[in-house]
Amino acid sequence: MAGLKLQAVTKSWGGKTQVIQPLTLDVADGEFIVMVGPSGCGKSTLLRMVAGLERVTSGDIWIDRKRVTEMEPKDRGIAMVFQNYALYPHMSVEENMAWGLKIRGMSKAHIEERVREAARILELDGLLKRRPRELSGGQRQRVAMGRAIVREPAVFLFDEPLSNLDAKLRVQMRLELQHLHRRLRTTSLYVTHDQVEAMTLAQRVMVMNKGVAEQIGTPVEVYEKPASRFVASFIGSPAMNLLDGVISASGDRFELPGGLALPIGAGYRGHAGRKMTLGIRPEHIALSSQAEGGVPLTVDTLEILGADNLAHGRWGDQKLVVRLAHQQRPAAGSTLWLRLPEHQRHLFDGETGQRV
């Protein structure tokens, strides 16, 4: 096994536009890291720099304690799995998996041994003589992974490998990837825009935005304690409710436009008068009553999801989404009285967006 280290890595186009801000990341031996973020955030560019397909503008990349910053891709000890399977249509599954080893000059016996072992791990034993056109999307992606496995790389690089699959296959392949990593324990760097993939596959998640690593942490840490307003809005489905306001002069209330306010703890008195964003996840909002001082939500629409429901509505001029139990189905125009538990709230600086 081998670790991966990025040391103050940057990438600029034309010497001007910096698409990757100075970024440092230590990936332990056998760790599975997922980079997630919206299109254009720099995650695929960063992966390509690790692979050697893009030059680093500044900084260093280390794989298995070796500096590989200027090395060619073939010398870095990596194997890459792409969104597009990139299989040779005229070759069988076995030939596709073996091709990279053949051009490296390995013996036939050694190649056969590696291919058979990879096929066994990926349950492709009965498909080795088939051509790609005879396979399903999930089977083709397993062949692409098998081609990477036979290389026995120091690091696996995955570039949105499940994006071309339908919803059911994506679930199946996520489970297979988890099982594969438990067996191989190979250091892995995985890129996706799908937060469900990120949260279910990763040992640690790196949330990226405009070339910056906004937060690096376990899925639980990123969900429970988002480091910034961006992370709070990106991680979670539906997204966290975000309310813009200001800490009152007395420091004991969060004041919103339209005369609305929420009581807050004494710990924020030092922030009196500061603009803030208050966040709370839809699943953390509780039902209350007018007598208990609840917040009135006028229901606009109801999404019935099966296991639970989402009520979209307004508290004054503020939009809120609340997750309800399956049997709770308020009609449009009705009022729900809500409680926003203080221990479930998050506060972010109104200017920097960073967690307070």
UniProtKB/Swiss-Prot annotation:
Top EC class of this enzyme: translocase
A GO molecular-function descriptor: ABC-type glycerol-3-phosphate transporter activity
Gene Ontology BP, a term: carbohydrate transport
Domain ABC transporter: 4-235
Reaction equations catalysed: sn-glycerol 3-phosphate(out) + ATP + H2O = sn-glycerol 3-phosphate(in) + ADP + phosphate + H(+)
Keyword tRNA processing recorded: no
GO cellular component term, pick one: ATP-binding cassette (ABC) transporter complex, substrate-binding subunit-containing
Pfam families given in the database record: ABC_tran (PF00005), OB_MalK (PF17912)
UniProt function note: Part of the ABC transporter complex UgpBAEC involved in sn-glycerol-3-phosphate (G3P) import. Responsible for energy coupling to the transport system.
Family: Belongs to the ABC transporter superfamily. sn-glycerol-3-phosphate importer (TC 3.A.1.1.3) family.
UniProt protein name: sn-glycerol-3-phosphate import ATP-binding protein UgpC
Native species: Salmonella typhi
